[in-house]
Design a protein with these regions (language model features):
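C-terminal catalytic domains of large/alpha subunits in multi-subunit enzymes
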Residues: 1-164
Length: 164
């Protein structure tokens, strides 16, 4: 994708507070994100670059932390975590879920994409759940480029992170 440019635009329309209309639209906000996973020669994750459109970045440091936390959480979903159930009851203990340890976390490069003048609360469109949505797909795509094997279930199998 290097050297390519992508463009998209969305404007959420809401009704003013106190508007006398049936079923008023009080808020609407959409976030957009993209992530890229870079593997090293051994197939371990070296870096994840995560670009997120947040509208107005009210607290950039907090946004970076939210992006990093969402990436780490989703890395666990993608690579190591299992939550087995037996008749709808969890069978794993916390220590056996496969949560990533701090020394397993790669470099995460958060990129905050701002668009000024949005007609939403303070111009901010949020940075919650979306931080963990693109990660697993980005990791699966990186492994596909790495070894040509399509992986379609989580946690991804046949990676250096796969539990024996």
């Amino acid at each position: 994708m290097e050297g390519q440019e992508f463009y998209g635009e969305y404007l959420g329309k809401t009704d003013p507070l106190g508007a006398d209309v049936p079923n008023p639209v009080s808020h609407i906000a959409y976030g957009y994100a993209t992530q890229v996973c870079i593997l090293n020669e051994e197939g371990k994750i070296e870096q994840i670059v995560a670009a997120h459109d947040v509208g107005k970045a009210v607290n950039p440091l907090s946004i970076e932390g939210q992006i990093e936390g969402g990436v780490v959480m989703s890395m666990g979903y993608a690579l190591t975590e299992r939550y087995p159930l037996d008749n709808c009851k969890p069978t794993a203990k916390y220590g056996t879920l496969g949560l990533l340890r701090a020394n397993q976390i790669p470099e995460i490069t958060p990129i905050i994409v701002e668009k000024q003048g949005l007609n939403v609360a303070c111009g901010a469109i949020g940075i919650g759940e979306i931080t963990s949505i693109p990660t697993a797909r980005a990791i699966a795509d990186a492994y596909f480029r790495y070894d040509g094997r399509l992986r379609t279930s989580l946690p991804l199998e046949n990676t250096p992170y796969t539990r024996k």
